[in-house]
Amino acid sequence: MDIKRTVLWVIFFMSAVMLFDNWQRSHGRPSMFFPNVTQTNTASNATNGNGASGASAAAANALPAAATGAAPATTAPAAQAQLVRFSTDVYNGEIDTRGGTLAKLTLTKAGDGKQPDLSVTLFDNAANHTYLARTGLLGGDFPNHNDVYTQAAGPTSLAAGQNTLKLAFESPVKGGVKVVKTYTFTRGSYVIGVDTKIENVGTAPVTPSVYMELVRDNTSVETPMFSHTFLGPAVYTDQKHFQKITFSDIDKNKADYVTSADNGWIAMVQHYFASAWIPQQGAKRDIYVEKIDPTLYRVGVKQPVAAIAPGQSADVSARLFAGPEEERMLEGIAPGLELVKDYGWVTIIAKPLFWLLEKIHGFVGNWGWAIVLLTLLIKAVFFPLSAASYKSMARMKEITPRMQALRERFKSDPQKMNAALMELYKTEKVNPFGGCLPVVIQIPVFISLYWVLLASVEMRGAPWILWIHDLSQRDPYFILPVLMAVSMFVQTKLNPTPPDPVQAKMMMFMPIAFSVMFFFFPAGLVLYYVVNNVLSIAQQYYITRTLGAAAAKKKAS
């Protein structure tokens, strides 16, 4: 029997490992067993002798024939382009005059001596990574992202005392149409105004459409080991609300999303940060998501423009968000935009938990202590359930010697052994599963808190005490993972010893296995689990001691 159980445990363990490896590969992570074929990005960052960026041109050249109604993918003309560098209080970036494309955008957040430099590059057009925001016209041979624009004269930095910075770019005349594209940056804001003025300088009416798209490769962003957050396009409409689209679904032509709307937005989502085009509410638009190169994808909207007579013009305004996934800020920008902060399937529980965590942080001013206090509050709320669980485990621990005696007596007759055990449970009024149900009820809450701490950009660069300077990074000295292992070991000792030796060994092995994982988890997550375990040990010790005192008093009387 022991050999059979050992074999079953080995099969279970290997199955779990293989399932985890398959999960890793399905989410774009390297396999533990099978080597990945290295994919190279076709976009180049070569520059010409005059400082012109060839990256956008290379990306454009890589695009196959576009789907009907999607943005053009014509070969870029030979005209030279250049990069226009700009800076605001929250951004440093580059606009490529080829298409007036936002080709590089760095979110600047300098360190203050106590906290590290938290600057991060979101948009980029390098040899190993492509992520762009671009616009253009459809419906004829009109200016698009392949044409070289001319920068209008003006400042490129947000000066002290200045609240806005405008950068304007003018296209060449194509098809009797000229486009003036204006980016408006506002102090303290991660929302960029993008205005497209379409001038008909020809002799016949034109009916163009404006496309706005985000182009990105499938390069994964750095996340903690054993953790996964969503990376890919997303679409939000009033019809279907938030729809995430994986790169693998696009590869398989299985992308499911609303293709026409007059509301909502489209986005590219990654861990902690996102970008989103937000067209004018009420403006009809078509939505497209597609693969345009072996490792390059795009999500965009195509917005029709009413007929423009010769000598007349039309204006199309939109907003481009590019910044951190700060929930409260996102709620004020556009309906549903806060959903880019990915809580997975536990959103309904995770959002209230983050709200509570945020309120606690408002009082204590430290995210580490906010985690400690929130965990304490959750344990207090669930104390009645935990007490019921610990009481059941304590009663099981009391009758364990008698259970072992029955198993030894009837080891050759499993049917009689089970009947004797059931009679013992009935006599002692013990439910062998009584300790499980209260724990199962609490699991969704603890999983939700896990996702809150994993997905919240507020943890990035947030210190706690002493050696913990960033709750989003692993403990540099592994002190918290060691405390986690010790707390799990203590919990194991407090629980009833399984009668099966194999199960007993597995219970002893679990703290070691989990500790290995927690060595790579963000410090904020490990802090939560350590505090939760310490409080659980204290609760269990208190309840067990109270029950023991009550039993001794009853026996004495």
UniProtKB/Swiss-Prot annotation:
Keywords: Cell inner membrane, Cell membrane, Chaperone, Membrane, Protein transport, Transmembrane, Transmembrane helix, Transport. GO terms for biological process: protein insertion into membrane; protein transport. NCBIfam families: PRK01318.1-3, PRK01318.1-4, yidC_nterm, yidC_oxa1_cterm. InterPro entries: Membr_insert_YidC, Membr_insert_YidC_N, YidC/ALB3/OXA1/COX18, YidC/Oxa/ALB_C, YidC_ALB_C, YidC_periplasmic_sf. It is a multi-pass membrane protein. The chain crosses the membrane at residues 3-23, 363-383, 437-457, 476-496, 507-527. One of its GO terms (cellular component) is plasma membrane. HAMAP family: YidC_type1. This is Membrane protein insertase YidC. The lineage of its organism: Bacteria, Pseudomonadati, Pseudomonadota, Betaproteobacteria, Burkholderiales. It is found in: Cell inner membrane. Belongs to the OXA1/ALB3/YidC family. Type 1 subfamily. It comes from the Bacteria. The keyword Nucleus does not apply. Interacts with the Sec translocase complex via SecD. Specifically interacts with transmembrane segments of nascent integral membrane proteins during membrane integration. Required for the insertion and/or proper folding and/or complex formation of integral membrane proteins into the membrane. Involved in integration of membrane proteins that insert both dependently and independently of the Sec translocase complex, as well as at least some lipoproteins. Aids folding of multispanning membrane proteins. One of its GO terms (molecular function) is membrane insertase activity. It holds the Pfam family 60KD_IMP.
